[in-house]
Design a protein with these regions (language model features):
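N-terminal "cap/leader" segments of large eukaryotic alpha-helical scaffolds
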Residues: 2-18
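Alpha-helix capping and inter-helical loop/turn segments
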Residues: 3-4, 33-48, 54, 76-89, ...
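Amphipathic alpha-helical elements of HEAT/ARM-like alpha-solenoid repeat scaffolds that form extended
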Residues: 12, 22-37, 66-80, 102-116, ...
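HEAT/HEAT-like alpha-solenoid repeats
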Residues: 14-18, 55-62, 91-99, 132
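Positions within ordered alpha-helical repeat solenoids
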Residues: 15-18, 75-79, 96, 111-115, ...
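Amphipathic alpha-helical segments within extended alpha-helical solenoids and repeat-rich scaffolds
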Residues: 49-53, 102, 130-139
Length: 173
């Protein structure tokens, strides 16, 4: 079935960041597949979404919202799209935001990149240089915004620092 108005398909696809798994889990995959969208069109939509988020990320002041935007972008770029140009732009934006993010968020972003071995290999040197060139010693360890989230109440500053040191050692190796 080919439908000329793809707005519903695009809405579903982007809501799940292109993840068929998540569409299936919430019972939207069958509905989405009826639109018969090409992979090329899906890639275009994902690139547009990443570009849109990147264009506004510097305006976001709330640490939790900023982290969510990075998580959203990195999920797309590490799980679905793997676009090195957009990943490079994302890492450059991340570098500018380092002074605003808490160490918990920085660590989570680095771990997300680390989980994709191919991307980690391609961007490890750049990430290492970024971390070395930025003093984050004055950054909060766990921001007030992050501390309000479910699940973070069990985190201690010591645990966050320990995890951050672990990811730093992976950058060094």
């Amino acid at each position: 079935m080919i439908i000329k108005d793809y707005s519903e398909a695009k809405k579903i696809f982007l809501h799940y960041n292109g993840s068929y798994f998540h569409m299936q889990r919430e019972e939207y995959l069958e509905q989405y597949m009826k639109f018969n969208i090409s992979k090329k069109e899906e890639r275009k939509w994902l690139k547009e979404k990443v570009e849109k988020i990147l264009s506004t990320i510097s305006e976001v002041k709330n640490i939790n919202l900023k982290y969510d935007k990075y998580w959203n972008i990195l999920y797309i770029l590490t799980e679905t799209l793997e676009d090195n140009h957009l990943l490079d732009k994302t890492i450059s934006a991340f570098e500018k935001d380092l002074k605003y993010l808490d160490i918990f968020s920085i660590n989570m972003i680095l771990e997300m990149i680390h989980d994709n071995k191919k991307i980690w290999k391609n961007f490890k040197k750049k990430l290492k240089k970024i971390i070395q060139n930025n003093d984050i010693s004055k950054n909060e360890i766990i921001s007030k915004e992050q501390n309000k989230l479910k699940g973070t109440q069990f985190l201690t500053e010591d645990k966050v620092i320990k995890k951050y040191r672990e990811i730093l050692s992976k950058l060094q190796s």
